[in-house]
Amino acid sequence: MRILVLNSGSSSIKFQLFEMQTKTSLASGLVEQIGSSSSRAVLKANGEIYEIKRFIKDHHDGLEAMNELFTTSHTLHDLSELDGIGHRIVHGGESFFSSMIVDESVIKKIEEISPLAPLHNPGHLAGIKNAMKESKNVPHVVVFDTVFHQSMPEYAYRYALPYDVCKTHHIRKYGFHGTSHRYVCKQAAKMLGIEFDKFNAISLHLGNGASACAVQNGKSIDTSMGLSPLEGLIMGTRSGDMDPAVVIYLLNIGVLKWNEIDNFLNKKSGLFGICGSSDMREVVAKMQNDERAKLAFEMFCYRVKKYIGSYYAILGRVDALIFTGGIGENAPNTRQKICDDLKHLGIHINHELNFSNERGERCIDEDGAKIKTLIIPTNEELEIAIETARVIKERTL
């Protein structure tokens, strides 16, 4: 069974082809800067790199360029050879509680909730519509970042704002990185020999975007991101949790204008706002001689530690603390700082294992630690492919 995974943005298409029997990637690539004179398409397969440099007008042209690369690399001759195509969708709102086969009603619902994710869902829709034209007889499946968090109880996802306003306008905590949290938790449960529906964990997806998730009996019961990915942990350029009155104050004194709020909170804040760099590698490298870099690092780790304590309290029993994402997988200094002084919770990492150059899934806790501390590289594309295959198989039963 071969599944193609598409992640279509406003000006890009990321793609990966999987053989599901072995769960291996046959090819991966990117169409970027769609609509620009510098647009191009790149594919990696069989240890080779294939590239097309030409003007790519829109998503239709982008998919044609992808098809050309598949043909040139002899990995796929036509999309009709596929068993399914899985599409990543950032926001499913309150309309979707599981991955779905795409039909007109699904497309209409995604269009209706696009105001909740104006930067992402329109690009996803463009990719879906054009891919369906190119492969009419292949089943298409949508996999939502928000679905894993639909198991949160109302007292966890509801904001303490006027109830009727929130209900009418679908204002609530949705959470994101759900595909990543689900994948790494499944892998961790398998690694520890625990049935997933009995597995409790605190999952930390730490990258330029960052979120924490409390998982109880294999289900998300709370997560740090909210209506948008802005809430929660400090991120590369996003503020995370803050007092909303700060924005009101800055508007009142004329420092901010209404049309500058989004850019201020999403692009100019976080690590970048504190020390001028959004890259944790640069922050760590500058810490010794730069007080603001040191402050940014300490603020980031402190915020994560607060969420660990909070989620420990609501879970009661924690089988594993999981690190994933670019920072979670590759920044031992950050992991060490986050886990320092958590021995009273049963979290105790081994210094040598934490700083080891070993890669892949691994335990980094001390022998006898009550809670296993794991590094699990995320693979959202594979999880989307697995979900796509599952939905297609269930439809044929």
Swiss-Prot record:
Site-annotated residues for Transition state stabilizer: H177, R238
Molecular function as annotated in GO: acetate kinase activity; ATP binding; magnesium ion binding
Residue intervals passing through the bilayer: none
Keywords, alphabetical: ATP-binding, Cytoplasm, Kinase, Magnesium, Metal-binding, Nucleotide-binding, Transferase
Active site positions: D145
InterPro entries in the cross-refs: Ac/propionate_kinase, Aliphatic_acid_kin_short-chain, Aliphatic_acid_kinase_CS, ATPase_NBD
Binding site for ATP: K14, H205, L206, G207, N208, G209, D279, M280, R281, G326, I327, G328, E329, N330
Gene Ontology cellular-component annotations: cytoplasm
Keyword Transferase: yes
Similarity section: Belongs to the acetokinase family.
Protein name stated in the entry: Acetate kinase
